[in-house]
């Protein structure tokens, strides 16, 4: 038995509600007899009548929610049954909980199937166990622990858990969980709710810099980059990324592939400025395309711009080789030569910013396009003129004109000759 005097501090330290849980200061004030607040009474989860689920009777909504979370398909079937509706009105004395559960079940009508069943069970479990974790398709996790769950799943290669966490965010189930808590008075969760809505937008994009990788780094701000080239360097800060990549290229000769989803997501989640343009270019290009490689170079250049003392000669030299096909997109031969020379310069210096600016300068691209358009017009005009000169009509007209000129010249010569003869 726990002594009566210790019940209050034990209840406070073990409280499921983070806001109600005692801190060290609370414990100190309790021991000094100056504590001004007490732990809230433990909520009574008992039911008036038992409910049977999977051959077992439950007299506690929290225990029932736990069982529902594990066997969610069977739970959804029972929740939609007449037997459960009867128990709901006879077995629960909490009228507010009855009203909430009725609303959840009614609103789920017509949404059968795995997704509908999972959402129904998740919402019911949250209502029955408001202080408990989120339960979805057998996964039980507190939303503030979702980042750790995802990190562990990625580390272990647990694809099933990765898919479940992604669904929780993508389908708005995590956001709904927060909203449900906010309605019940947890106004402190407003910021977390907004954060998960932002994550929902990230996971809906499939391109590099988004998806589950972006969620992984957003939920774990101190997680090191999981990209293979830097996996052994423990790059948890953006400051350490470029030196690690440069060292890897120095040792291995290349990164293997330039467009890396983990590196893109790591940069996007840690960088101070906006990288929307680079991410958009990555999303609308294939990973092996020149456009995608230039966009990835732009992300790395953003990092170098933030830490300008970090020159990367090995990485930049490799990038210059990778981006040689980008020079071919320019039409002017002299411009291609100048860009190639500039790229060789930045390769030696390790200037990623200069490399990106050289290949993404909109003014140079526009000037080159304008020059090509002018050259096309001049070529078209020249071909049209050649065609006109070679046409039968022009040849006949030229001959007629020649005949007239020849006749005129002959007439002049004849006239001059005649005058000369008679004058002589």
Walk through the language-model features, giving the residues of each:
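Conserved C-terminal C-lobe helix
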Residues: 2-16
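A conserved short helix/loop substructure at the end of the activation segment
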Residues: 14-27
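Terminal low-complexity "docking" segments
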Residues: 15-16, 58, 79, 392-396
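Regulatory extensions appended to serine/threonine kinase catalytic cores
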Residues: 36-103, 125-133, 138-151, 155, ...
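ADP-ribosyltransferase catalytic core
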Residues: 98-122
């Amino acid at each position: 038995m726990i002594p009566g005097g210790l019940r209050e501090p034990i209840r406070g330290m073990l409280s499921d509600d983070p806001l109600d849980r005692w801190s060290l200061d609370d414990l100190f004030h309790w021991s000094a007899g100056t504590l001004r607040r007490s732990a809230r009474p433990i909520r009574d989860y008992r039911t008036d009548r038992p409910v049977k689920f999977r051959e077992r009777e439950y007299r506690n909504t929290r225990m029932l929610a736990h069982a529902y979370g594990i066997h969610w398909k069977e739970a959804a079937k029972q929740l939609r049954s007449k037997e459960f509706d009867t128990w709901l009105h006879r077995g629960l004395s909490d009228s507010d909980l009855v009203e909430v559960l009725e609303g959840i079940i009614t609103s789920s009508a017509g949404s059968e199937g795995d997704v509908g069943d999972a959402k129904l069970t998740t919402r019911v479990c949250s209502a029955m166990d408001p202080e408990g974790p989120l339960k979805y398709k057998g996964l039980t996790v507190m939303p503030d622990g979702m980042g750790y769950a995802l990190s562990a799943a990625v580390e272990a290669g647990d694809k099933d858990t990765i898919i479940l966490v992604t669904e929780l965010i993508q389908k708005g189930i995590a956001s709904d969980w927060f909203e449900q808590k906010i309605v019940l008075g947890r106004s402190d969760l407003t910021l977390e709710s907004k954060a998960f809505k932002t994550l929902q937008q990230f996971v809906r994009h499939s391109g590099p810099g988004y998806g589950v990788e972006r969620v992984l780094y957003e939920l774990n701000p101190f997680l090191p980059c999981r990209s293979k080239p830097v996996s052994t360097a423990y790059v948890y800060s953006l400051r350490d990324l470029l030196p690690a990549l440069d060292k890897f290229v120095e040792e291995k000769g290349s990164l293997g592939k330039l467009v890396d989803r983990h590196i893109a997501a790591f940069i996007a989640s840690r960088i101070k400025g906006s990288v929307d343009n680079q991410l958009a270019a990555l999303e609308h290009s294939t990973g092996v395309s020149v456009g995608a490689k230039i966009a990835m170079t732009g992300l790395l250049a953003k990092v170098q711009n933030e830490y300008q003392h970090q020159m990367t000669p090995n990485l930049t030299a490799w990038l210059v080789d990778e981006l040689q096909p980008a020079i071919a997109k320019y039409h002017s031969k002299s411009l291609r030569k100048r860009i190639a020379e500039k790229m060789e310069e930045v390769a030696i210096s390790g200037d990623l910013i200069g490399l990106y600016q050289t290949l993404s300068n909109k003014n140079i691209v526009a000037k080159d396009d304008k020059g090509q358009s002018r050259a096309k017009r001049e070529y078209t005009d020249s071909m049209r003129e050649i065609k006109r000169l070679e046409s039968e009509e022009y040849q006949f007209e030229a001959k007629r004109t020649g005949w007239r000129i020849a006749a005129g010249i002959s007439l002049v010569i004849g006239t001059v000759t005649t005058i000369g003869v008679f004058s002589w």
